[in-house]
């Protein structure tokens, strides 16, 4: 049985062109070593269109029965099957050479190849990504993308407990450091033996390009600094974003904000995220045009979007960078008590920006989303953060991906919403169920809104209402609301920018 699985896996690698015919014996013997086997009887049966997921399952089941890992959980299985797949992954220098060769023909050919390679090697577990639930919800801001993430493994209590007993390690320093490439992993750090990273320069500084293993959207890429330095929204950041889309015009690239609450989950390592995807925010129209003094050549406007987005566009990226520098400089120190915007309290800074760059034909576009992380007694996790009544759907930060209109909702909602649908159809009070009690008030609102909820329409209704809750999360994160007072506040800020003198460099 295991001989068949080994042959299938080697055949898969040949089919995907990860290895060549001359590599078969070497790779087979490498697998035997990992599996603790001394011999191999090659099956006569030939295989075609090998299913990677089921073949790896066979190998993992065999390995667990042979006590090659202690617990039959996702954490241990992922560590082991990454070691197995590393047998077929080429050396970094060869991968880089192939990428650069294709890049000279076309940036898109290079990324197409690299994305497929990252899936074929099982670094991106495509069969898991397919399990994510996805739909679109119509809102006043256009269709929002809603996803419930099922591909990222849940934290394993046994692995967490075992990790606490292990000797603590600070290598790699974080999951974005270049030193992850080829790392075998441990219980509290994923295996990265199958990852390959592409080096390149942004403004004369060394960065690397890789894909996210969880692919929240098409060709979800991560661009990260070669050094372990903190995130920072500044001149260099704007230069890097626009420099990247100049190199890869079919991609977008953005940065999480550099402050807690409004930033992402990793603030300690300078990095950006992007990919080959048109986000809902990019489809949103300019609601009102803005004229910035000394920048009449730059098209600018407020975007019709729940967060406060200033869209800048020009053929000249240097002009965008200069204006973005000015807007950021003013925003960092800007206080408007009338709009409850404070640059700092007790020495703690609050104002920052979530920037995103993309290209539309020959125009460079820079989206500058104004953020503020102030907390209050009423909103201890942030005034411009999803408010408490929405936490039953999303309590986490509104980071870069959500800012652009794609909800990455927690996996717990898969079971909770399925149960809630059943309760809505059968008129059961969710408050009586520990799994769904957090949704009880929301369920009442849904019942009041829809007079006829039945088994044929309940899923569509719950999905729509989930999307509308996400839209409200984005509205909460907006520093200027979509009303007259919000527009007046936005205008006051722009007036302040226009009064700011230019810095001569």
Region roles according to the model:
Residues 236, 245-265, 274-328, 332-335:
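Catalytic or ion-translocation cores adjacent to nucleophile or general acid/base/metal-coordination motifs
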Residues 260-268, 346-352:
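Beta-rich nucleic-acid/ligand-interaction surfaces
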Residues 218-225, 263-279, 369:
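Histidine-centered divalent-metal-coordination microenvironment in nucleic-acid enzymes
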Residues 194-198, 226-253:
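Helical scaffold of the NTase/Pol beta-like nucleotidyltransferase catalytic core
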Residues 1-223, 227-231, 304-306, 320-324, ...:
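Active-site microenvironments that recognize anionic phosphate/pyrophosphate groups
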Residues 209, 253, 270-272:
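Hydrophobic faces of well-ordered beta-strands that scaffold small-molecule active sites
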Residues 171, 266-270, 278, 294-297, ...:
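Short alpha-helical interface elements
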């Amino acid at each position: 049985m295991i001989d068949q699985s080994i042959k299938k896996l080697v055949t898969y690698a040949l089919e995907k062109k990860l290895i060549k015919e001359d590599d078969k014996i070497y790779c087979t013997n490498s697998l035997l070593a990992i599996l603790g086997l001394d011999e191999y009887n090659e099956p006569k049966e030939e295989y075609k269109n090998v299913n990677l997921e089921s073949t790896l399952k066979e190998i993992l089941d065999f390995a667990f029965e042979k006590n090659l890992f202690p617990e039959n959980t996702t954490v241990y299985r992922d560590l082991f099957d990454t070691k197995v797949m590393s047998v077929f992954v080429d050396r970094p220098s060869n991968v880089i050479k192939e990428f650069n060769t294709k890049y000279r023909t076309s940036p898109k050919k290079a990324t197409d190849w690299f994305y497929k390679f990252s899936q074929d090697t099982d670094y991106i577990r495509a069969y898991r990504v397919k399990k994510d639930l996805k739909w679109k919800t119509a809102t006043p801001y256009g269709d929002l993308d809603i996803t419930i993430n099922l591909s990222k493994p849940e934290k394993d209590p046994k692995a967490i407990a075992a990790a606490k007993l292990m000797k603590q390690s600070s290598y790699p320093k974080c999951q974005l450091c270049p030193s992850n490439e080829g790392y075998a992993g441990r219980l509290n750090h994923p295996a990265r033996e199958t990852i390959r990273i592409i080096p390149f320069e942004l403004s004369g500084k060394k960065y690397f390009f890789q894909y996210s293993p969880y692919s929240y959207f098409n060709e979800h890429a991560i661009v990260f600094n070669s050094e372990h330095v903190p995130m920072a929204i500044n001149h260099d950041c704007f230069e890097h974003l626009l420099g990247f889309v100049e190199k890869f015009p079919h991609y977008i690239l953005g940065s999480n904000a550099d402050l807690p609450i409004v930033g992402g989950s990793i603030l300690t390592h300078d990095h950006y995220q992007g990919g080959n995807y048109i986000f809902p925010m990019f489809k949103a129209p300019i609601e009102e045009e803005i004229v910035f003094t000394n920048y009449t050549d730059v098209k600018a406007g407020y975007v019709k979007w729940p967060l406060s987005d200033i869209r800048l566009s020009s053929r000249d990226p240097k002009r965008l960078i200069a204006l973005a520098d000015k807007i950021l400089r003013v925003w960092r120190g800007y206080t408007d008590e009338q709009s409850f915007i404070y640059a700092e309290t007790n020495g703690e800074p609050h104002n920052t920006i979530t920037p995103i760059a993309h290209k539309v034909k020959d125009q460079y576009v820079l989206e500058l989303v104004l953020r503020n992380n102030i907390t209050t007694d009423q909103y201890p996790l942030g005034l411009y953060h999803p408010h408490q009544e929405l936490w039953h759907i999303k309590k986490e930060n509104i980071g870069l991906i959500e800012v652009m209109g794609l909800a990455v909702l927690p996996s717990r909602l898969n079971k909770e919403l399925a149960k809630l649908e059943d309760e809505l159809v059968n008129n059961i009070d969710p408050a009586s169920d520990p799994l769904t009690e957090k949704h009880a008030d929301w369920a009442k609102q849904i019942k009041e809104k829809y007079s006829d909820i039945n088994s044929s329409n309940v899923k569509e209704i719950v999905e729509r209402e989930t999307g509308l809750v996400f839209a409200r999360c984005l509205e909460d994160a907006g520093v200027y609301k979509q009303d007259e007072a919000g527009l007046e506040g936005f205008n006051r800020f722009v007036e302040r920018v226009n009064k700011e003198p230019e810095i001569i460099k």
